[in-house]
Amino acid sequence: MTSTTSPTAVDATAVVESVAELVRENYVFPDAARQLAELLRRRNAEGAYRTGSAEELAEAVTADLRSVNGDLHLALQFHAEPVPPDRGSAVLAAMRRDFDASLGGVPRVELLDGGVAVLEIGPKMFPLDWAAQPLTAALSLVAPARALVLDLRRNTGGDPNTVAFVCGYLLDGRTHLMTMLSRQGAVAEQSWTPPFVPGARFGASKPLYVLTSGKTFSAGEELAYDLQQVGRAEVVGEATRGGAHPRDGWTVHPHLELSVPVARGVSPVSGTNWEGTGVRPDVPCDADAALDRALSLAVARLA
């Protein structure tokens, strides 16, 4: 009988060493990065990762990565399909499948009674070079509505540039949304609404409600947070998941990608972000009830 090796078989020690070094070199919080690298190496020496399964290793390492400060963007992610070797390409490959299955990230555009439009953006904030065209079409379509409900309950993150692009349709004039700080604490980048967006704007004066759930994450949270902080929208629903640190990805095995936050966002309004706390709704309610609640608020305001 000829033995075969599973395509997802894993040399745990080699993977863990790669993960430890990448975290130590790149995690946005240097002190925590050193702690985590030491923890992973110690746990490996203790036999905590003694498995031949890439999926099991991913679960165990992710639990330890999140044990120091609860950063949900720290993860060793298992992919059933082989991971492209280029940096960050595993997430992009998965995103492409979601993009094609969700009408380019705008699965719902609807006009309801009373002139209230509902626009769902999800399941991701797809890269702007993919998403600009479908978002422009959808946002231009809802521009004449009397009020807008923006549904982010199923949005689990993506591209911050897409967040700024969407905000450009909902705000008047250039608006500073977020400052990204590097590992050294220096300003790495600022996020502003664009000076021009194609198509028609909904604008800054009409009622705007943003729906959230406990699943809303990362860039989905940023869109809700940015609009809330500048006083543009009321957030309706549940507190979000609480991940505010932009991440990058490294392939460390044919089926494993390491996700590491490489910056942290700071709002020019609050001086902080939603890391660990989530975006707190202005109108708390169950996610399943959020649309009806927002519609009732919109109708009352328009009456």
List where the protein language model places each region.
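Extended, small/polar residue-biased N-terminal targeting/export presequences
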Residues: 2, 30-114, 298, 302-303
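Terminal peptide-recognition signature
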Residues: 19, 65, 119, 150, ...
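Solvent-exposed loop/turn segments at secondary-structure junctions
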Residues: 80-83, 123-127, 154-160, 176, ...
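STAS-typified acidic loop motif
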Residues: 99, 103-132, 269-270
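Short acidic catalytic loops
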Residues: 118-122, 142-157, 211
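A short, well-ordered alpha-helical element
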Residues: 127-146
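Gly/Ser/Thr-rich loop/hinge elements
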Residues: 157-207, 245-251, 262-264, 268
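Low-complexity, Gly/Ser/Thr/Pro-rich intrinsically disordered linker/tail segments
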Residues: 275, 279-303
